Amino acid sequence: MMAIPEAQLLPLKADAHGVIRVAGTRVTLDTIVEVFNDGASAEEISHRYSVVSLADVYAVIGYYLHNT
């Protein structure tokens, strides 16, 4: 029998100005999405913005793809 994985919270937080950022960083959701749409892989994005873990990059991209 396959176990159902726990739901994971998105690593996104809105700042005082309403800008959505990857939690614990200054990197915005828009930045991740723009670089992804320009053709960067999740690995390249995580390397470019080293404060964002690869898992968080995948979570943000998944959120973006699911909601567009």
Tell me the role of every PLM-derived stretch:
Residues 28-68:
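Long, charge-rich, low-complexity alpha-helical segments
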Residues 4-21:
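Short, Lys/Arg-enriched N-terminal segment that forms or immediately precedes the first helix
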Residues 23-27:
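Short helix-coil-helix linker/hinge
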